[in-house]
Amino acid sequence: MLELNKIYCGDCLDLMREMPDKSVDLVLTDPPYGTTVCKWDIIVPFDPLWQQFNRILKPGAVSVITGTQPFTSLIINSNFENFRYIWYWEKEKGVGFQNANRQPMRIFEDCCVFYKNLPKYHPPKQPLRKRRIRRHTDSNTKSESCHMESRNYVNKTIKYDFETPINCLHFPRETQIGENYHPTQKPIALFEYLIQTYTEIGDTVLDPFMGSGTTCVACVKTGRNYIGIDKEPAYVEIARKRLEKVNNTKLSEWF
């Protein structure tokens, strides 16, 4: 049986068989998209993957799987019955510069949400962005007020977060500040947001393609249990070092 708050090196399809039924609150993972020549970037068969997810997920649990096209279409169609919607992670800079003379650079990455039964859903507030605010005249009071596209008014100042999230999430990558561990690394803050949206403190999150361990780090920072799996020993070692660092940081905050 796989233990909580541990990471494992191996094939996730084999290791997940050691997990109990209905033991996971969230699967959050960034699997291989099959879009590069890297030896690890091979798409895992979807049928056995969903078979294990469906077995180990609790009722009302969620799977959030990142992707870009054409992988996004493949993963959605592999479980169309349980596909619900997409969060779009907006990057600071577009990618695909080598093809910029033939097609637009890509600035979004997808986070595909799957579930059977209505899950927990309490997304953290998102910061109010200037481009989403316009001037609005209230016909009853004849006075101007700030007005959001969601038609919720903002009182007096615009420094407050808005309560209804949009499906576009903007989080900077740690690679911009020198913390580059993996070629497809996602921001810790992005995964913290998704973890907080679909789980509560003490819940269990599985990442069967953990890479350099971003999901596990985000779990530690948000008070969730994690299980991480990856078949590449080098990245498992990187993940261990990152977890040691974040655990030591949390320990120092207590004293």
Predicted features, each with a name:
Residues M1-I229, A234-I238:
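Core catalytic lobe of class I
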Residues M1-L2, R240-F255:
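Short, conserved SAM-binding/catalytic segment
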